[in-house]
Amino acid sequence: MYIWEHDNWPALRWDDEKLSRVLARVSREQGRLLGKMEGLGFPLRSEAHLQTLTEDVVKSSEIEGAKLDSAQVRSSIARRLGMDVGGVVAADREVEGVVEMMLDATGNYAQTLDAERLFGWHAALFPTGRSGMRKIIVGDWRDDKEGPMRVVSGAIGKERVHYEAPPAKRMPDEVEKFLAWFSAPGDLDPLLIAGLAHLWFVTIHPFEDGNGRIARAIADMALARAEQTQQRFYSLSAQIRRERDEYYTVL
């Protein structure tokens, strides 16, 4: 039985006792980092912000097996932030799309996350309407015309199903519930909100592709919202990339 098949879905539960110590330790480290950054001058903070965003974009794509040119990513971010870094490198459409999504998520964290905004992010990720060679539904919820949305591995004919997402007909309702919670998650630790948002979004898997990258952008948005700053000085995706095997095992 998958998590979304339980009667109490989507009422997610967790062990407060086990999590509280970990969350407290991470929060302390966050505070120390942000405190140190406050003591630096604007140029150094801006460069750290640029480096963090570049790493976040590159590593989030790497998690999915996609390789982006880091120079293109850095140049695209710098241009959008109005930073003069010299040696501007032209970025392709795929890079521009991922950068656009990440900057919108972290830079406009105070704006409401709704379905249209998610559609815009998804369209930015797939500007050609294709994922690799395969044509996909872009800027709208997936359908089940080719069967249920499944995460599989193995050779053709010997596939192993790791996960099956909720039926496509449930997507409007499932996403509406998620967005309502995300707009008012209550008095929870910001790190817990980011983690729950990520898990919830990849569980419903509303798009034909790109769900992982969008889920991580949502988590980054939750963290930026909690810190009340557009500047990022640590990368969630970089850490996940370092622990990718464990990440997929947990999912």
Predicted region positions:
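FIC/Doc superfamily catalytic core
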Residues: 1-251
